[in-house]
């Protein structure tokens, strides 16, 4: 109600009104009436949410979306809300989100969130909306963050979100497996050292080539086949022929790029070459990369910048220097770099996410303990697919113990 009552005056004070048109002025002059007032953007829809309010505005002639984006801070103070963000929906229509409190202080994900294959909710945005990791839209991602920045919790949320889906999880954890091996029951392949990681990545490259052979055989290119039925990736194949998609999670990628001897340098070059090939060619074969690390710059050697250029999705938790933030957002948005280095140390899990379009937002993943992630992976262990090319890297685990249920209650002894 406060927003509706003060809407016209606030918009005029913030410079978001346009003067009346000539025909309205002429009509008022002919009717001997007062000159009409300036007009603010028209409200198309007003929708209350659990965190605030969403306005959909129709811009007046001469206005653009940048005018609204440039005044969000003034709108925040004028309406007395915690935060205001805006985004352009289509030409001439802007959505303005107002939040009444800091939704990132205590993250509460909605009870029901929209899920689709390869699209999972992982965090909450500062405007109260759910942040999704959509592998079909953004195939490969890079996650950076210093120690104790919440990077591992974000990775756990990814695994927990993917666990119920029909997807093969492949993990490379060179910290001797302390992060990913507790979740091993939901992983189709795991590697805990650079030597095993090299063999695993080369096996993935071989699997990718086999998938392309399958797509080539099932393309169904002929004069009589409509274009819509021609297969170009695994999602165009029939469901009974479609290979299972693979998500590759790499923790502490710097461990794969460091070397001290000539033999380790050769191994490192082969690892980076395999990662670059998967990043360049893996999308159509249903192979998606999720690279995590503390730094990911050119000091890690040749091929790193080529690999980084293929990682469209960027997420940066708290970093210790501006250079690390530039590694994630230097080619995306200078404002995102500034936001990443301003994340305080007492808010682990807060991150800045962006993509190659230049858009970015602050997010925070809900705190998921390792025990909770293990329980989710154990619950969905039966959904772990068998990938023949990766069978040699399948973790060998003992079966889960079956809980014994007594058939009858034991009666207490009586005197």
Curated annotation (Swiss-Prot):
Residue span, FtsK domain: 127-326
Gene Ontology terms for molecular function: ATP binding; DNA binding
Keywords, comma-separated and alphabetical: ATP-binding, Nucleotide-binding, Plasmid
InterPro entries named in the record: FtsK/SpoIIIE/SftA (IPR050206), FtsK_dom (IPR002543), P-loop_NTPase (IPR027417)
A Pfam family matched in the record: FtsK_SpoIIIE
Keyword ATP-binding found: yes
PANTHER family: DNA TRANSLOCASE FTSK (PTHR22683:SF41), SPORULATION PROTEIN RELATED (PTHR22683)
Protein name: Transfer protein TraSA
Organism: Streptomyces ambofaciens
């Amino acid at each position: 109600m406060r927003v509706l009552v003060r809407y016209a005056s606030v918009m005029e004070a913030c410079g978001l009104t346009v003067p009346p048109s000539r025909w309205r002025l002429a009509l008022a002059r002919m009717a001997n009436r007062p000159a009409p007032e300036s007009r603010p953007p028209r409200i198309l829809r007003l929708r209350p949410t659990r965190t605030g309010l969403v306005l959909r505005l129709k811009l007046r002639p001469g206005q653009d979306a940048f005018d609204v984006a440039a005044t969000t801070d003034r709108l925040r103070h004028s309406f007395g809300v915690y935060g205001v963000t805006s985004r352009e929906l289509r030409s001439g229509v802007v959505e303005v989100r107002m939040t009444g409190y800091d939704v990132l202080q205590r993250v509460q994900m909605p009870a029901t969130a929209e899920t689709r294959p390869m699209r999972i909710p992982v965090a909450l945005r500062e405007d109260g909306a759910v942040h999704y990791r959509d592998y079909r839209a953004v195939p490969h991602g890079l996650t950076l963050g210093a120690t104790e920045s919440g990077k591992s919790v974000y990775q756990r949320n990814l695994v927990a979100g993917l666990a119920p889906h029909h997807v093969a999880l492949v993990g490379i954890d060179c910290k001797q497996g302390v992060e990913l091996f507790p979740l091993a029951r939901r992983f189709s392949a795991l590697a805990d050292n650079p030597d095993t990681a090299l063999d695993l990545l080369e096996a993935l490259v071989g699997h990718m080539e086999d998938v392309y052979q399958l797509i080539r055989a099932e393309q169904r290119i002929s004069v009589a086949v409509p274009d819509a039925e021609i297969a170009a990736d695994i999602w165009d194949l029939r469901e009974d022929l479609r290979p299972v998609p693979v998500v590759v999670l790499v923790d502490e990628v710097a461990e794969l790029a460091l070397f001290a001897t000539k033999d380790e340098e050769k191994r490192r070059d082969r690892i980076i070459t395999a990662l670059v090939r998967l990043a360049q060619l893996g999308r159509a074969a249903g192979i998606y990369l999720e690279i995590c690390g503390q730094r990911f710059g050119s000091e890690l050697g040749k091929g790193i910048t080529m690999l980084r250029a293929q990682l469209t999705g960027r997420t940066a938790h708290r970093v210790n220097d501006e250079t690390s933030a530039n590694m994630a957002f230097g080619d995306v948005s200078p404002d995102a770099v500034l936001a990443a280095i301003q994340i305080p140390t007492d808010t682990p899990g807060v991150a800045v996410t962006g993509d190659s379009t230049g858009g970015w937002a602050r997010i925070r993943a809900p705190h998921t303990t390792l025990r909770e992630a293990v329980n989710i992976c154990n619950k969905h262990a039966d959904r772990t697919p068998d990938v023949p090319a990766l069978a040699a890297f399948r973790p060998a685990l003992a079966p889960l113990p079956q809980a014994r249920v007594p058939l009858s209650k034991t009666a207490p002894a009586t005197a």
